[in-house]
Swiss-Prot record:
It comes from Arabidopsis thaliana. Disulfide bonds join 79-113. This is Early nodulin-like protein 10. It is found in: Cell membrane. It holds the Pfam family Cu_bind_like. CDD domains: OsENODL1_like.
Length: 182
């Protein structure tokens, strides 16, 4: 029984620590269509959204009159549907973003891309979301004669914590009661 509980805890921990998210394209259903105005396009939405390796894009659309094509940058710019990397027409398309860099998607229906039904997504590299802190400028310190050299000062950037470490700490804290049951 305790080994089963331990396996369950490990699976739960793995699930909590995984970073991939499922992101609904446009933030809601039926956004995969030619925009009604140039004020709010899918590219404006994607520019406000941070995408990481392991995230999945989910399109919900009417499969009877639309589709999703993953294309190269030049095909995206020209709205060229002739040689897609991949094509989807299921109405519930889910694509995992497995690498950093740009991804390009256009509608597979005649004239839709030309009317703005297209999406460019940029996936951040794994190192991009880490905080970069420059080293502080050197400071000349004059020590008083009574200064105790055995006391160590805290590092200048001690208040900075990697966000991933914080998530890991909370996940472990949540799992601690389960571990006590084993």
């Amino acid at each position: 029984m305790s080994s089963v509980m331990m396996c369950c805890c490990l699976l739960l921990l793995f699930g909590l620590l995984s970073e991939g998210r499922e992101i609904l394209v446009g933030g809601k259903s039926n956004t995969w269509k030619a925009p009604e105005s140039r004020d709010e396009t899918l590219n404006q939405w994607s520019g406000r959204t941070r995408f990481k390796i392991g995230d999945s894009l989910l399109w919900k659309y009417n499969a009877e009159n639309d589709s999703v094509l993953q294309v190269r940058q030049t095909d995206y710019e020209r709205c060229d549907r002739s040689e897609p990397i991949r094509g989807y027409k299921d109405g519930h398309t889910n694509i995992e973003l497995k690498r950093s860099g740009p991804f390009y998607f256009i509608s597979g229906e005649e004239g839709h891309c030309q009317r703005g039904e297209k999406l460019r997504v940029v996936v951040l590299s794994p190192n991009h979301n880490r905080s970069v802190v420059d080293a502080p400028a050197p400071v000349n310190i004059v020590l008083s004669p009574n200064y105790n050299r055995s006391v160590a000062a805290a590092p200048l950037n001690a208040h900075i914590m990697n966000k991933g470490s914080l998530n890991t700490a909370w996940s472990l804290l949540l799992l601690l009661p389960l571990g006590l049951l084993v």
